[in-house]
Structure formats: C-alpha cells, structure tokens
C-alpha cells in the first residue's frame, strides 16, 4: 500500500510505499478523521501523530466520510457531496464510492501529520514550500500580520512577482475582498435609509387603507340601516292600509 503523507505546516507532501503488512496493521479498521500514532512505520516516525484523511482502492474509487463500511457502495450524489462534481445545474448521479473504514484493499491511503515527532523526515518536514498566493480576504490579511482595525490592510497585501523575458519585472496583487471603505459604509447607510423609507411608506399605506376600509364599512352599515328602516316603513304602511280597508268593510 502507498501512503500519501502531507505536512500542512511546511506545505510538503510525500508518497511512500510500504510493503510490510505489520506496519500497516495500525491503520486497519480505523475510520476517516481518526488520529493514529505513526510509530509502527519506522524509527524515524517516532512521536509522529497522523490523521487519516481519505484514500483510494485498487480500482481508483475514493473513500467517502460517513459511509460506515469497508466495502464499496453506490450512492446517489448531488452538488455539495464529496466524490462528485456535477456537470449540469441540479444534476444527480449514482456513483460508486468506498466506505470510510480502512482495510487491506486500498492502494493509497492519505495521511496528514498532526503532531511532529523527534526526527525530521527528509522531503517532508525539513524543507518548506512557499505559498504561491497570499490571503485575499481583509480579515485574513489582518490575522496574518496581526493588524488592528485601525491599520490600513492595503499596505500589507502579498504581491506576486511576474517576470517575463525582455520585459520590465512587475508585481501583481489580488483585489482585497470584504474591505471596509468609506464608500462601502455609504452604501450600507443608503441601504438602511431605503429600508426605513420602505417601512415608513408601507406603514402609511396600511394606515390609509385601514382608514378607507373603516369609511367604506361605515357607509355600508348606514346603507344597510337605511334599507332596514325603509322596509319597516313600507311594512307598517301596508299594515295600516290593510287595517283601514278591513274597517271600511
């Protein structure tokens, strides 16, 4: 089995092949995201602690977190799931994935070093790979350089040098995201003001409608009362007429 070991602190990654089954037994029956001591791999790994981050079986199917089996299953996957990239909007597909439990049928096991041991591993912990790009978000630039809210972030952007043959060397900087500027604050104030105006307008319209509704209800009530009074007058008139006719007879 091959072990793909990475060390985030230096940005290095190394692929080693382990033929001895006894060295690998410490990883068997362990689940993804489990932290395991790497001492059985050899003397140089003494004190190292690694986390199982994934792997692939001999046919190339990836391990999927949350699938509690050491075999292969077919799952209906959609956008947002691991082990699947949709090609169309809303597309779902049934894909074969391997469970999150490690066994001997894996060809590659991915490990991340959580704690460094006593000795350096050549090509993994003794050298550093510089990051190609610096942080882009304002809060992350502040965190990197330990800046306060009063400091200007724009002066601390990590610029990337661009060199071309026969041309003057220049640098390129990313556009800072979530940067709070007077313009952003102005837009925010405008949004809040517009929201207040909309709320007030809705309130005024609701009050006006309630007033109109009360007026219409009052008019309808008066109309109904007039009709009832008219009906009563007519019925009393008819009653008096019938009485007078009967008395004449």
Curated annotation (Swiss-Prot):
Pfam families associated with the record: Ribosomal_S6e
Phosphoserine: residues bearing it: 235-236, 240, 244, 247
Record-stated family: Belongs to the eukaryotic ribosomal protein eS6 family.
UniProt keyword terms in alphabetical order: Cytoplasm, Phosphoprotein, Ribonucleoprotein, Ribosomal protein
Region (Disordered) location: 219-249
Native species: Ictalurus punctatus (Channel catfish)
Gene Ontology cellular-component terms listed: cytosolic small ribosomal subunit; nucleus; perinuclear region of cytoplasm
InterPro entries reported in the protein's UniProt record: Ribosomal_eS6, Ribosomal_eS6-like, Ribosomal_eS6_CS
Principal localisation: cytoplasm
UniProt keyword Ribonucleoprotein present: yes
Subunit structure: Component of the small ribosomal subunit.
GO biological process: cytoplasmic translation; glucose homeostasis
Annotated compartments: Cytoplasm
UniProt biased composition (Basic and acidic residues): 219-228
Protein name: Small ribosomal subunit protein eS6
The organism's taxonomic lineage, starting at the top: Eukaryota, Metazoa, Chordata, Craniata, Vertebrata
């Amino acid at each position: 089995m091959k072990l793909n070991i990475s060390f985030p602190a230096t940005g290095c990654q190394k692929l080693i092949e382990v033929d001895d089954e006894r060295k690998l037994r410490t990883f068997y029956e362990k689940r993804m995201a489990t932290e395991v001591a790497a001492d059985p791999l050899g003397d140089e790994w003494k004190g190292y602690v690694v986390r199982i981050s994934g792997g692939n079986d001999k046919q190339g199917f990836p391990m999927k977190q949350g699938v509690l089996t050491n075999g292969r299953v077919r799952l209906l996957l959609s956008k947002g799931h691991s082990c699947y990239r949709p090609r169309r909007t809303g597309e779902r597909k049934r894909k074969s994935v391997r469970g999150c439990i490690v066994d001997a049928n894996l060809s590659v096991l991915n490990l991340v070093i959580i704690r460094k041991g006593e000795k350096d591993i050549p090509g993994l912990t003794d050298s550093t790979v510089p990051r190609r790009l610096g942080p882009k978000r304002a809060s992350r630039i502040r965190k990197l350089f330990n800046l306060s809210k009063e400091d200007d972030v724009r002066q601390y952007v990590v610029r990337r040098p661009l060199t071309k043959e026969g041309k003057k060397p220049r640098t390129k900087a990313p556009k800072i995201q979530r940067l709070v500027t007077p313009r952003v604050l102005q837009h925010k104030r405008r949004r809040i003001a517009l929201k207040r105006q909309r709320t007030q307008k809705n309130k005024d319209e609701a009050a006006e409608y309630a007033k109109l509704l009360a007026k219409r209800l009052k008019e309808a009530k008066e109309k109904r009362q007039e009709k009832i009074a008219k009906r009563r007058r007519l019925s009393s008139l008819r009653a008096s007429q019938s009485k007078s006719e009967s008395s004449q007879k």
